[in-house]
Amino acid sequence: MRIEHDFIGQMEISDEVYYGIQTLRASENFFITNDKLCSYPVFIKSFAQVKKAATLANVQLGLIDEKLKIAICHACDLLIDGKYHDQFIVDMIQGGAGTSTNMNMNEVIANLALEYMGHQKGEYQFCHPNDHVNRSQSTNDAYPSALKIAIYERLSNLVAPMKALRDAFAQKAKEFAHVIKMGRTQLQDAVPMTLGQEFETYALMVDRDIEQVLDARNWVRELNLGGTAIGTGINSHPDYRSLIEKKIQEVTGRPFVMANNLIEATQSTGAYVQVSGVLKRIAVKLSKVCNDLRLLSSGPRAGLNEINLPKMQPGSSIMPGKVNPVIPEVVNQVCFAVIGNDLSVALAAEGGQLQLNVFEPVIAYKLFHSFVILGRAIETLTTKCVEGITANEKICHDYVFNSIGIVTALNPHIGYEKSAMIAKEALKSDRSIYDIALEKKILTKEQLDDIFKPENMLSPHAFKKHKD
């Protein structure tokens, strides 16, 4: 055991751990979610990148020596490479605007650096968590900057599964291009379309959301490093701000810049609201698609039954043979959670006061949670559902030609009133539109066959009105 102290008192710390007294206090104070910082390696990596960039700037400004720089950068590189992440034990939701997270990072880096230099953990006179690792920084600029860097990476990582889902829908659109089916509005028969057209819209929806995700990265490119406590830059070198911008770009390989006004950037959480809004948009639209898939596959004998979803597991403990659409159902629920997380982000952003928003920890937690579950849900939907969907072509075809909805195709030829009369009689007599129109000699068989050709009902085409 080793003894560490702060201005509150002292505590015993295990010699096996790399965190220190402030981390231990925080872990005891904030047992809230049991979801710890180590659950989000992208945040640990981005925070280590901030610390490394700051160290590189500090040594160039003569604020720390070369020996410390080498040791601290070595420690940061270990964390960036995914090592020692189990040392990050603070709860994601915490009081203090993220100070506990920042100090967990400072203490682990300091003790790794001490070990590298041949010292014992806790010998902070040689490398101090605050004086050296946190030099030229405050939690109030380090935490949000690390968070934005992590969000940038999570946005980038979300693109690949979204592209896979888009491509899966596009492939189904090609497979189903020849399958005519009934389009529906307000759950009522409308006009014909193809199943391929239906799936093509899903592919396009995802493609447009990919554009939104890529654009959202621009909202988190502005950092507030160098602002320190409230954005005025107190305790930082006059040249630190311009230098840290270059160093963070070098360390991350990403186009991050410092905000023009660091005071505004320190208190603003608008970028998080925008990013969360994009995730909510994806969730809302994805949930709607899952609603469609569940409805289109309903049955199999007393529902629409136009498509078949892959059979994943038995669906009932009491009804033999029942199979449920479990994959769309789980994605629906993920989407509900993401939408709820967005509300939490909005409330936390609104709750800020004066020069700092202390609620960034819950913003970070909800955003990371949304990224994780949404990414997994998209992958699950792609591989366990969409790729295995098949069409019930005969059912789709029969729905069209037994439907009242195809009467719409007669409108340009015989007018609305005659078409409505035919529809009314078809409903009353339970006969087809085609048979009634032919029986009443409103149109010839040749004319009806031409009008009801699938290709003439699926897209705009030239026509001429038939005489009475």
From Swiss-Prot:
The keyword Aminoacyl-tRNA synthetase does not apply. GO terms for cellular component: cytosol. Keywords: Lyase. Residues 315-324 are annotated as: SS loop. Its EC number is 4.3.1.1. Pfam families: FumaraseC_C, Lyase_1. The keyword Phosphoprotein does not apply. One of its GO terms (biological process) is tricarboxylic acid cycle. Gene3D superfamilies: Fumarase/aspartase (C-terminal domain) (1.10.40.30), Fumarase/aspartase (Central domain) (1.20.200.10), Fumarase/aspartase (N-terminal domain) (1.10.275.10). L-aspartate binds at residues 99, 138-140, 185, 317, 322. PANTHER family: ASPARTATE AMMONIA-LYASE. Homotetramer. Belongs to the class-II fumarase/aspartase family. Aspartase subfamily. This is Aspartate ammonia-lyase. The lineage of its organism: Bacteria, Pseudomonadati, Campylobacterota, Epsilonproteobacteria, Campylobacterales.
